[in-house]
Amino acid sequence: METKRQGMVVWLHSLKQSKALRKFGNVHYISRKMKYAVIYCDMNDLERHMAKLSSLPFVKRVEPSYKPFIKLEYESKLDKAKEYDYKVGF
């Protein structure tokens, strides 16, 4: 059974302590230039991890990813004239 996972972006003051982020979830990406890390963890533990991370001295701020809540399947609503134009060529 798969668990639902959600990402969070952790903005850091310095990258020296970036290894300490491993205990909060899977570290997916660390940007050296912009000083942030993307971490994935279980959705059930997200709030607890965000509270712990924001209390650490080397963390500027923590933002959750909203990707699980965004609708990824779109419906196309074409009017009859455009639908006819698309079918003419075939």
Curated annotation (Swiss-Prot):
This is UPF0298 protein BPUM_1393. Its main location: cytoplasm. One of its GO terms (cellular component) is cytoplasm. It is found in: Cytoplasm. Keywords: Cytoplasm. Disulfide bonds: none annotated. Belongs to the UPF0298 family. InterPro entries: DUF2129. Pfam families: DUF2129 (PF09902). NCBIfam families: PRK02886.1. It comes from Bacillus pumilus (strain SAFR-032).
